[in-house]
């Protein structure tokens, strides 16, 4: 991750398998105000040791799914990120 | 009204029915998902649900508004999901809807459970017999990341059409429906057939048909042409087979007999039809038969008439006596002129018999 712009601190929530791998249900992370989803995912995966499930993860930003990993995301201080493995509700 | 809830206690179905009740509703549909005790042959000891609470409720509400936009008459919608440990055979999720008529209720509930499994961030972990770690289940309908495994960013690539591989440039793609395709094939087949037919005519047509006659009504087999009847005022087309080869056209073929005899005769390559040749022809077989039967031979005569004469002779002789052949005379004319008379039985009267006996007596007296 390149720190070529302002950086904000956001909350990260982990669920299911990702929580077991990260060893915590929530944490915080510094992210640039503008970043592509792929880079964000890579950063989270490397920081929290989620490599084994990387290809099945979806991210949610402020309770909305990030559908395309090529999307650019704009962060504000205190935003909420969630690491979401494949669902098994119902 | 929309009732969306995450609960930690057993779901109260009766309460949900109360939530659905409405005077204007004739139907309510309730889906209950319960926990199973087995998965792929493994026995489930316990299972537990966890959720991203705030987002789960948000997604469940989105489902409700989706339902209302698709099915306008829905009255009440209930989506309850249980979290934490759920014992086997208890309800983990209840989705219900009520509406004036049943189709909306039934369809909307079915849609809703599919949507829940796809979008709502809830996870289930199952612990199996003999396995302490447990397993996080994954719905096959669950949303998945869209990128490919290789991580390649297709969106960043400019679009370039590869034309150089696979399809040869000599091929053309035709996109038509089945009916059109069948029609085209049929037309092609017919055209090919006509082509072959006209080729046949050209290949097989006889030389004595004038080539500038219209051959469109001809095929190689009949060689038919249109001939207008002379002095006919009729405007109908008369079609006559102009077949110069058949036995019915004998008068048009004066040399027919000759040609036929040629066929019957020698194949030693002599093509000159002179009398000399005919004499030396080994119609000798027929000659032998004729002489044996006592008939005159005439090589000039039509071969069929000769054979016919022999046949007639045979029939005649057979009718006379089956052992005729031992008594055949070699003078045909006399034989023909005076065929042996049949012996007729004579019936005698009594007086004739008496006279006859008397004569014999008289004769015997002399001896």
UniProtKB/Swiss-Prot annotation, chain A:
Transmembrane segments: none annotated. It comes from the Eukaryota. C-terminal thiocarboxylation occurs in 2 steps, it is first acyl-adenylated (-COAMP) via the hesA/moeB/thiF part of MOCS3, then thiocarboxylated (-COSH) via the rhodanese domain of MOCS3. Pathway: Cofactor biosynthesis; molybdopterin biosynthesis. Belongs to the MoaD family. MOCS2A subfamily. Acts as a sulfur carrier required for molybdopterin biosynthesis. Component of the molybdopterin synthase complex that catalyzes the conversion of precursor Z into molybdopterin by mediating the incorporation of 2 sulfur atoms into precursor Z to generate a dithiolene group. In the complex, serves as sulfur donor by being thiocarboxylated (-COSH) at its C-terminus by MOCS3. After interaction with Mocs2B, the sulfur is then transferred to precursor Z to form molybdopterin. This is Molybdopterin synthase sulfur carrier subunit. It comes from Drosophila simulans (Fruit fly). The gene is Mocs2A.
């Amino acid at each position: 991750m390149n720190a070529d712009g302002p950086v904000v601190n956001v909350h990260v929530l982990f669920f299911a398998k990702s929580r077991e791998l990260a060893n915590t249900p929530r944490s915080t992370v510094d992210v640039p105000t503008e970043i592509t989803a792929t880079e964000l995912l890579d950063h989270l995966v490397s920081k929290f040791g989620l490599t084994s499930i990387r290809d099945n993860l979806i991210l949610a930003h402020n309770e909305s799914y990030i559908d395309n990993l090529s999307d650019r995301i704009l962060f504000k201080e205190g935003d909420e990120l969630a690491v979401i493995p494949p669902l098994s509700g119902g | 009204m929309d009732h969306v809830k995450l609960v930690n206690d057993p779901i109260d179905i009766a309460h949900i029915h109360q939530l659905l009740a409405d005077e204007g509703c004739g139907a309510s549909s309730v889906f209950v998902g319960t926990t199973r005790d087995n998965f792929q042959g493994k026995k489930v000891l316990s299972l537990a649900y966890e959720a991203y609470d705030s987002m789960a409720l948000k997604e469940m509400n989105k489902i409700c508004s989706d339902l209302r936009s698709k099915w306008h008459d829905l009255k009440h919608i209930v989506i309850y999901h249980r979290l934490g440990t759920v014992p086997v055979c208890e309800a983990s999720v209840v989705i219900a809807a009520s509406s004036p008529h049943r189709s909306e209720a039934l369809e909307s509930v079915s849609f809703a459970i599919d949507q829940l499994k796809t979008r709502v961030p809830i996870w289930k972990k199952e612990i199996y017999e003999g396995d302490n770690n447990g397993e996080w289940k994954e719905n096959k309908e669950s949303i998945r990341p869209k990128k490919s495994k290789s991580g390649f960013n297709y969106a960043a690539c400019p679009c370039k059409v590869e034309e150089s591989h696979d399809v040869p440039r000599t091929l053309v793609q035709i996109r038509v429906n089945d009916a059109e395709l069948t029609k085209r094939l049929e037309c092609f087949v017919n055209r090919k057939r006509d082509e072959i037919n006209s080729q046949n005519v050209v290949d097989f047509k006889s030389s004595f048909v004038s080539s500038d006659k219209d051959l469109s009504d001809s095929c190689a087999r009949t060689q038919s042409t249109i001939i207008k009847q002379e002095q006919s005022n009729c405007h109908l087309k008369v079609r006559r087979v102009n077949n110069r080869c058949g036995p019915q056209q004998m008068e048009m073929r004066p040399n027919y007999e000759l040609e036929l005899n040629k066929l019957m005769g020698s194949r030693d390559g002599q093509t000159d039809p002179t009398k000399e040749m005919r004499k030396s022809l080994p119609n000798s077989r027929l000659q032998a038969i004729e002489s044996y039967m006592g008939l005159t031979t005439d090589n000039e005569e039509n071969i069929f008439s000769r054979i016919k004469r022999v046949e007639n002779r045979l029939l005649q002789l057979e009718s006379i006596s089956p052992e005729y052949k031992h008594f055949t005379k070699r003078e045909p004319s006399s034989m023909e002129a005076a065929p042996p008379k049949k012996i007729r039985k004579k019936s005698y009267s009594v007086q004739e018999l008496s006279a006859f006996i008397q004569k014999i007596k008289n004769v015997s007296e002399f001896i």
